[in-house]
Curated annotation (Swiss-Prot):
Subcellular localization: Cytoplasm
GO cellular component, one term: cytosol
Protein name: Leucine--tRNA ligase
Chief location: cytoplasm
Alphabetical keyword list: Aminoacyl-tRNA synthetase, ATP-binding, Cytoplasm, Ligase, Nucleotide-binding, Protein biosynthesis
Organism: Brucella suis biovar 1 (strain 1330)
A GO biological process held by the record: leucyl-tRNA aminoacylation
Amino acid sequence: MAAERYNPRVAEAHWQKVWEENRTFETDNSDSREKYYVLEMFPYPSGRIHMGHVRNYAMGDVVARYKRAKGFNVLHPMGWDAFGMPAENAAMQNKVHPKEWTYQNIATMKRQLKSMGLSLDWSREFATCDVEYYHRQQMLFIDLYEKGLVTRKTSKVNWDPVDNTVLANEQVVDGRGWRSGALVEQRELTQWFFKITDFSEELLAGLDTLDQWPEKVRLMQRNWIGKSEGLQVRFALAAGTAPAGFSEVEVYTTRPDTLFGAAFVAISADHPLAKKLSEGNAALSSFIEECHQQGTSLAALETAEKKGFDTGIKVKHPFDDNWELPVYVANFVLMEYGTGAVFGCPAHDQRDLDFANKYKLKVTPVVLPKGEDAASFSIGETAYTDDGVMINSRFLDGMTPEAAFNEVASRLEKTDLVGRPQAVRKVQFRLRDWGISRQRYWGCPIPMIHCESCGVNPVPRADLPVKLPDDVEFDRPGNPLDRHATWRHVKCPKCGGDARRETDTMDTFVDSSWYYTRFTAPWENEPTDRKAADHWLPVDQYIGGIEHAILHLLYSRFFTRAMKVAGHVGVDEPFKGLFTQGMVVHETYKANGQWVSPADIRIEEIDGKRVATMLDSGAPVEIGSIEKMSKSKKNVVDPDDIIASYGADIARWFVLSDSPPERDVIWTEAGAEGAHRFVQRIWRLVAEAAPALKDVAPKAGTQGEALGVSKAAHKAVKAVGDDIEKLAFNRGVARLYELVNTLSGALQQAADGKADAEMKGALREATEMLVLMTAPMMPHLAEQCLAELGGKVAGKETLVARAPWPVFDPALVVENEIVLPVQINGKKRGDLTIARDADQASIQQAVLELDFVKAALNGGSPKKIIVVPQRIVNVVA
């Protein structure tokens, strides 16, 4: 009898209710089974989830459900990264309080995530804007302050003039604010910093232990930490050019081997010498002010046009007093990096070459590529940055750059310049301390108090939390806390006199730098329960976008170490395994030059071409390129619409099946339709065969078609398990398609009453295996199918969500036959299929029975038959 169509709306709502009522996915910290902690980067509550969320959380859910089935005690929590500027912007634009806006969005997105059927432990849910969470963050801040890992200092900062707040270097992208897109300016402010540089060497060395991280991410962090071994060289100022009080410029370089190619020295706009020279020099003062309009990050410097101001001052070359180099103030040198001064070797650094060409400075190559002639070698528009041998370098000529480095260092270390060595070897790091002060309201208050008599001191622990006031106004840019009539006024905890609260709040990346530890015991009064944290950490599998490679992931690695120093955790690394998934992308569409939504168009196949028109008017629509889903280009697919039309399982299945998970997946209506048909096919095959299989005990077949069914199922169990372990979800999906194709004929026979007892036993086992393997990807369908089969696995009543992963029989997975290529006189003519354990005599006899061998021998006998075991057969005629 034909089964009714599978109704995902009814089934999904039912099974989600069953899981919730049974508290199926709540995790007990006291469970003695081996732990497995899987976590996807928690979302910012922007208002609605998008298909990127669906893909990210579907991947994590596959891992969580699979590991549960494999017998692990799985922690799979969810929360909300809820502080940040968008809430304040919404408050200004829509006249709604950030708290109200945020919690409304959380409610909407939680409903959406629940509709996906994710196996999350919602009992551990928190938002970083919950007072209970940021209370513990303030406790952590004070702990780190007392351990000397928090400092307050004046420094150049990146100022976002639109968001009116400070940005960390990592938050400046191509010279612009990462959220506002505004050109960033430099300002000098007193800020709070986490001393991440105390861990520079540890953070770098730790990358070598993270063998389950993508190499690309490790390389990005390695470059950002930026360890370099170089030489700090003192260049004496030429007589008669230096202002009073200045006698030298100290330069840090990683390429002292190229000193004989030097064409100039460049100093930062904030270098003491530059400041001195700007006194009474309007042109230089104006140039320095221009330099301050760009960001303070190295990324900002790399993208900005390279500019310099010739100071007229000269320095002497370290190896030749008669060789003088011009000194420029340059916009690509930062005071915070190295010594705030560099020497430029145009031939072997592209930035220096561009600068030299712009200001018509001499370009002298000093490293000769292999195979080039020193007499004719010259530099064009591209600097030579590879290895070679030294030329035009006097006593260094003929050396390798490495040997030249050591020779220069050795000589200058022994050279006295005014009572000190002219150079010293130095290790530098690109990494800078993490400035966390933000001039905004919607963030975690920094728990410090300023007193004119006592200085700056922490808020007493008994007075925590420092809560954000609700009665604030967002009628103009800037920080409402600065303008609050009462909140900022407080008594000094030391002298009892009038004092004021710190009105800066913490960078929101602080909130996400330790949330994974809080999930291990979110009910604790302390920031962590040390026993629970040490049990669950590190996170076994972390999933999220590669855009967080430097920001969130590096900060989290620092925070774990800092929390270890403060006694809150016992591990160094937060995430054992890291997976960075690709994006969900979609075609773009335009009508009359305006972007239009996929929901508003119709696409048809006409004369072999895809033609798009507007649904309402029939107007033609231009089909554009495939791009990341974005609201601005309207190529967004709403998960709510997909789930309403097809169901959550189909949305999950499609984003897992269409491409390798590390690559982008292209969302198409045709792909969703294909997934829908597959779901209906599985349901029809199982439901129609269920009456014949419901009361049958599962048992592997031993012969004929029943054995074939069992072999296919057991091979799939092994392969799909291996695929999920490797996070190769698309390969696992492909194997399930294959298994359904293999089982379909036999299941139809069972539905028609044509299967014998052995086939029924084999089919019952194979169908249970299919259902259990499908469950991590399509959990609702799996539960519905098992219920149709009587709700039992291996004879025991269970939910699929609580059922163990099927176990394959190794004997059924091994191939008993082998295919051997057969050559005649060294050329392949065909293949021989034979038992894997066949001996040499049997193989030789079987080869002689092959038609193409008989034809080649023409009734005669071969001179010999060479058998390479398990590899190949060669007949010598």
